[in-house]
């Protein structure tokens, strides 16, 4: 029995579950979405909260430029570029016999400095918020000071009295670990069984304590939570339920709007924007989507992408069970090459806050991710890790979803003028030998 019903009963009441359980690639576009002006109220956070996070990152920019020289050219702002994907677009058009395809772009969070993934946004913001709170309370700085003062030995010794803990499949651990250690915190990253060895090695090389677990992501998070609960000096970064992570991700939207302006990309009712976001527990894509909805309103359509073996957010929202269920409850194993997306139980906070703002969800097989990795690398010279490719089939899924397109009332002209944005969540820091092994696998599937 699953929450009082047999699997057969679930499949009758929620037909898509049959395909999810069979590990088939599946798409679901939520008929229950609402206008942004109404649905944004569900979130419990506001544009002012996002502005506060943005201002905080601005205050810390001189510090970041000092301690991470690779951020100095951008003045200490951790941001990624956008790039067109013309060859990949052509491939998708041919594969799906697509008509009315707009343009296809990449948001290259894979190239973000410091930790090389989307998690540099939320993870670094939350650590900086905690550091700022401590430093202000202790009188180390005032809000108008030059925050490069926090790079001093005195500041590092002060932060060294405190601990930070987090549970991660890899990329969040990298961002939290590297940033916390740089400030001087004692930091522990609880890693799930699917975390890549190179990510653990990189953390240890940065002075981070890595605690390895034989179980999946949810257990790693719980262990981190327990460590912090037993130690008053330890701050726990809760990937399943963190407004500060969420807000750090949301800041991306205002910066993307500027990049679109510079590239001459229009976003409005006649020029819709579709954004494809790989989804694990949901904090990263949820936060980015929240920011996008604040900036672009009903002109942006956010779609979450998950592995066929870990469709936790799709399952949670589709059934209405959210974090009360896991993919394992339905006999799905949560074992995937997309390590950053290997999450069995979704964030209840994100699922409930964002369910009326996310247009749809789809799943993609590991084999497809490997194959797309090769195509993206060879055609458009893009280096992405497996989980970061999950957004690539999005344009195909949307343009083949006739019922969804009709429900939204899109005209052929609107679709021709649309922008499709793949959020490339990580990959630049994958070691060359590991990346070559991925490519070899992609060529063999």
Swiss-Prot record:
The keyword Lyase applies. Pfam families: PALP. Disulfide bonds: none annotated. One of its GO terms (biological process) is D-serine catabolic process. Its cofactor is pyridoxal 5'-phosphate. Its EC number is 4.3.1.18. The keyword Lyase applies. The modification N6-(pyridoxal phosphate)lysine is found at residue 119. It catalyses: D-serine = pyruvate + NH4(+). One of its GO terms (molecular function) is D-serine ammonia-lyase activity. Keywords: Lyase, Pyridoxal phosphate. It is an enzyme of class 4 (lyase). It comes from the Bacteria. InterPro entries: D_Ser_am_lyase, Ser/Thr_Dehydratase, Ser/Thr_deHydtase_PyrdxlP-BS, TrpB-like_PALP, TrpB-like_PALP_sf. Belongs to the serine/threonine dehydratase family. DsdA subfamily. This is Probable D-serine dehydratase. It comes from Pseudomonas putida (strain GB-1). The lineage of its organism: Bacteria, Pseudomonadati, Pseudomonadota, Gammaproteobacteria, Pseudomonadales. The gene is dsdA.
């Amino acid at each position: 029995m699953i929450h009082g019903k047999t699997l057969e009963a679930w499949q009758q009441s929620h037909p898509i579950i049959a395909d999810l359980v069979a590990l088939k690639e599946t798409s679901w576009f939520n008929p229950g979405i609402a206008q942004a002006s109404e649905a944004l109220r569900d979130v419990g956070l506001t544009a002012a909260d996002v502005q506060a996070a943005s201002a905080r990152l601005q205050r810390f920019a001189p510090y970041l430029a000092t301690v991470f020289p690779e951020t100095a050219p951008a003045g200490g702002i951790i941001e990624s570029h956008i790039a067109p994907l013309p060859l990949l677009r052509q491939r998708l058009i041919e594969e799906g016999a697509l008509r009315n395809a707009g343009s296809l772009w990449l948001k290259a969070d894979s190239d973000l400095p410091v930790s090389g993934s989307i998690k540099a946004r939320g993870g670094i913001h939350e650590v900086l918020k905690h550091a700022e709170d401590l430093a202000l309370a202790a009188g180390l700085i005032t809000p108008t000071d030059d925050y490069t003062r926090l790079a001093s030995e005195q500041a590092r010794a002060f932060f060294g009295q405190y601990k930070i803990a987090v549970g991660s499949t890899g990329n969040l651990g990298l961002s939290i670990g590297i940033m916390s250690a740089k400030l001087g915190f004692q930091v522990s990253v609880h890693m799930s069984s699917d975390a890549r060895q190179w990510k653990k090695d990189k953390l240890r090389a940065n002075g981070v304590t890595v605690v390895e677990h034989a179980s999946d992501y949810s257990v790693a998070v719980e262990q981190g939570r327990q460590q912090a609960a037993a130690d008053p000096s330890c701050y726990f970064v809760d990937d399943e339920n963190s407004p500060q992570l969420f807000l750090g991700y949301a800041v991306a939207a205002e910066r993307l709007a500027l990049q679109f302006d510079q590239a001459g990309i229009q976003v409005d009712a006649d020029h819709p924007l579709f954004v494809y976001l790989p989804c694990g527990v949901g904090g990263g894509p949820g936060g980015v989507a929240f920011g996008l909805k604040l900036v672009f309103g009903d002109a942006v359509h956010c779609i979450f992408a998950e592995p066929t073996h870990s469709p936790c957010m799709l399952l949670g929202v589709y059934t209405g069970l959210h974090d009360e269920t896991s993919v394992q409850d339905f006999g799905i194993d949560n074992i995937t090459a997309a390590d950053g997306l290997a999450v069995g139980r979704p964030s209840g906070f994100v699922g409930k806050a964002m369910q009326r703002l996310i247009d749809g969800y789809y799943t993609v097989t590991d084999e497809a991710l490997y194959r797309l990795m090769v195509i993206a690398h060879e055609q458009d010279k893009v280096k992405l890790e497996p989980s970061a490719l999950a957004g690539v089939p999005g344009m195909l899924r949307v343009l083949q979803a006739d019922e969804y397109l009709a429900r939204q009332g899109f005209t052929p002209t609107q679709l021709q003028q649309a922008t499709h944005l793949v959020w490339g969540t990580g990959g630049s820091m994958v070691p060359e030998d590991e990346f070559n092994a991925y490519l070899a696998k992609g060529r063999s599937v």
